[in-house]
Amino acid sequence: MTKSIKMWLLGIFSLCFLLPVKALQPQDSIRFSLLTCAPGSEIYALFGHTALRYQNFSDQTDLVFNYGMFSFNTPHFVFRFVKGETDYQLGITPYPYFESEYALRGSSVYEQELNLTPAEKWKLLSLLEENYRPENRVYRYNYFYDNCTTRARDQIERSIDGTVVYPEGKEGKTFRSIVHEFTAGSSWDELGIDLCLGAEADKPIDSRLQMF
C-alpha cells in the first residue's frame, strides 16, 4: 500500500547497515516485526504503509526492510501514480530514521512481532536479502496486487513452514469500496483513482485481497 516521500533519501545508508546473510545464524536473538503505518494526507500515503523490522539483539542491528521507496522527482509523479505507472523499490533504513519520519508528520506506527521459528526467521531474512539485490529491488507498483503490503505479506508467507490461514474478511467488500474508505476526504484523488479503475474493482474480494 503502500509510502513516505522523504524516506527514499535514506536508501544511501543501506549498504552501510545491511549485514551479509552468511554472517548470521538462526537464533532467538533475531526478531522480525510487521510495521503498520497510519495513512497520511498525500496521495501516495492515503492508504497507509507496511514494512518489516529486523532486529538482531546480539549485535544491536535494527533495520527496516521498506518496499515503499521511490523518488518524488520522477516526472509527472502524481499522474503516473494515479495511472499505476510508478516504480517503487525495496530499501533498507535504520529503524530510528523510519520511526522519526512518521513521528514528524504525526502518524502512528504499530508493531506486531511475527511468531516465527529460528529457521523461518533465517528464511525470511534470506528472501529479503535476495529481493534487495540490485536486479530485484525495483518493481512496478500496483494499488491492489503489488505494493508494500502485498510484498511484505508474500515474503512472510514464503518463509513459513506451513499454510497461513487468514480470518474471513468483511463480506461485500470490493477494491473500490475500500479505496473510497481511505479517500473520503480527498475528493480529487478519489476521482482520479476512480477514473483509472475498471469493472474488476467492483467485484467482491476475499480477506487476502483486502489486505492491499
Where are these regions (language model features)?
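Bacterial Sec-dependent N-terminal signal peptides
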Residues: 1-26
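Soluble extramembrane regions of membrane proteins in the secretory/endomembrane system
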Residues: 24-212
